[in-house]
């Protein structure tokens, strides 16, 4: 009887998950399921972006294997996959950068070889529970882009968000920096239009100022950066971002970062297990001689 109930539960989850994620999060940039090899340029860095780090248990692995949900396939890695990726980067002499260092080298015009900047969007509980311990173990710096108006919220687009207490614990390690992912403009409309892209100038400026104030008060935020919800931004809205006082913006795109990358369209590579295998491991920057 217990086995039968378990199967029914799993099947129900598999039916519900592809539907529920359509309303909530990251369908906008999950169209390409076949990562291609990254073009390599000397003097470049990799910005590796994560969203979910799943617990590697039987149920999660079962759901991952059988689900057709792009939210699960493209926007998450398991805890074991994440640790394997970190260990692979370390074994290939990656130079792990803080956000401050990353921006410094970009502005200076010269990245150290094999530069890697680890960052996370949304900051839900899976990051605290499954990624944070690994980064702490290996002493790897990271940046979290926080939806500041939903810190500690349960069931935000089917996600439980990290609490302020947990964020402060992470910050005190000296390994974490926190930046804005908006205060309350992270949503998709029914036609997959970003709430940020639809908002008025006054609404955007008010929202970003509120987010900046929260981050400055709690985490001494100083880098003036934003990770755009869903990685989406266009030239029509960009003047508003600048008017709000932000100096750098991060998108989602399968490209390495160079000093010449536009400061408001800095590409980050969305990491799944497939993306790491096909893009990161094959990047020529890890295979060139010093």
Curated annotation (Swiss-Prot):
CC annotations in GO: extracellular region
Disruption phenotype annotation: Deletion of the icaADBCR genes leads to the inability to form biofilms, produce PIA or mediate N-acetylglucosaminyltransferase activity in vitro.
Keywords on record: Cell wall, Hydrolase, Secreted, Signal
Cited SUPFAM superfamilies: Glycoside hydrolase/deacetylase (SSF88713)
Signal peptide: 1-28
GO biological process: carbohydrate metabolic process
EC number: 3.5.1.-
Primary site of residence: secreted
Role this protein plays: Catalyzes the N-deacetylation of poly-beta-1,6-N-acetyl-D-glucosamine (PNAG, also referred to as PIA), a biofilm adhesin polysaccharide. N-deacetylation is crucial for attachment of the polysaccharide to the bacterial cell surface; it leads to the introduction of positive charges in the otherwise neutral PIA polymer, allowing electrostatic interactions.
Protein name: Poly-beta-1,6-N-acetyl-D-glucosamine N-deacetylase
Organism: Staphylococcus aureus (strain NCTC 8325 / PS 47)
């Amino acid at each position: 009887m217990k086995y039968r109930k378990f199967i029914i539960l799993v099947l129900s989850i598999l039916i519900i998950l592809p539907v529920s994620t359509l309303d909530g999060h990251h369908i906008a940039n999950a169209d390409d399921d076949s990562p291609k090899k990254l073009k390599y340029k000397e003097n470049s860095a990799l910005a590796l972006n994560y969203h979910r780090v799943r617990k590697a248990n039987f149920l999660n692995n079962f759901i991952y294997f059988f689900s057709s949900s792009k939210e699960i396939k493209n926007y998450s890695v398991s805890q074991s996959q994440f640790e394997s990726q970190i260990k692979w980067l370390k074994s290939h002499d990656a130079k792990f950068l803080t956000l401050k260092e990353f921006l410094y080298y970009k502005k200076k015009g010269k990245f150290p070889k094999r530069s890697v900047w680890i960052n996370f969007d949304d900051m839900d509980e899976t990051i605290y529970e499954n990624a944070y311990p690994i980064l702490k173990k290996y002493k790897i710096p990271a940046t979290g882009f926080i939806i500041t108006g939903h810190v500690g919220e349960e069931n935000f687009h089917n996600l439980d968000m990290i609490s302020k207490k947990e964020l402060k614990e992470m910050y005190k390690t000296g390994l974490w920096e926190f930046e804005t992912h908006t205060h309350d403009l992270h949503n998709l409309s029914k036609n997959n239009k970003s709430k940020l892209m639809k908002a008025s100038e006054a609404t955007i400026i008010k929202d970003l100022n509120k987010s900046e104030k929260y981050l400055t008060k709690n985490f001494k935020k100083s880098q003036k950066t934003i990770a755009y919800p869903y990685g989406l931004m266009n030239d029509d809205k960009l003047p508003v971002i600048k008017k709000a006082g932000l100096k750098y913006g991060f998108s989602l795109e399968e490209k390495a970062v160079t000093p010449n990358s536009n400061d408001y369209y800095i590409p980050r590579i969305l990491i799944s297990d497939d993306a790491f295998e096909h893009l990161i491991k094959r990047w020529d920057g890890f295979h060139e001689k010093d």
